[in-house]
Design a protein with these regions (language model features):
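Bacterial N-terminal signal peptides
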Residues: 8-17
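Hydrophobic residues within membrane-embedded alpha helices
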Residues: 6-7, 82
Length: 173
């Protein structure tokens, strides 16, 4: 009886250990480190470091055509350069990350002070934007990105842009 119980306990322990190991993503730490590094590059403006983390043909689904018409890594570098010029004191905090397969999900908050007029905001305006990023990796490099901004932050930015403006214009008077 004792041998059967000991054997059952050993098999159960082995099963638990194997199932825990098989569900672990071996790339998780690498993907998280790359995501933190890329956010640090956005803050520092050292765009040449992006080559280490982002594929040359990467697709950013959040690319703003008013900033650049370039695609891939070249376009991403232009966007990073643009935002670093506008917000030279940008500080991004990564609050949470999760990895599922080849996809990383990150929750961040970025704060910076505009060095020049930006989207209707005067220079010197401080702005905080919270966002969720979805990043797909292939061959240890980021190949796709979607960014979703917190709409309450967007509304605050829009309201600060409209300060002093009349929201309803009476053309009859």
């Amino acid at each position: 009886m004792f041998k059967k119980l000991l054997t059952l306990l050993l098999i159960t322990t082995l099963f638990v250990v194997i199932s825990c190991q098989s569900s672990h993503n071996p790339n998780e730490a690498k993907y998280k480190a790359a995501y933190v590094a890329v956010n640090g590059i956005m803050d520092s403006g050292n765009i040449d470091e992006l080559d280490t983390y982002i594929a040359a043909d990467a697709v950013d689904h959040q690319m703003d055509p008013s900033i650049t018409t370039k695609t891939g890594l070249a376009g991403i570098k232009e966007v990073f350069t643009y935002y670093h010029r506008i917000f030279p004191d940008l500080k991004t905090t990564v609050y949470s990350m999760a990895v599922s397969g080849d996809t990383l999900f990150g929750y961040i908050s970025s704060t910076g002070t505009a060095s020049e007029p930006f989207m209707g905001m005067p220079a010197g305006t401080s702005q905080t934007m919270n966002a969720v990023d979805v990043v797909v990796f292939k061959d240890d490099k980021m190949v796709e990105h979607w960014g979703f901004m917190d709409m309450s932050d967007v509304m605050k930015m829009m309201q600060s842009n409209m300060a002093g403006e009349s929201k309803i214009e009476d053309k009859g008077k």
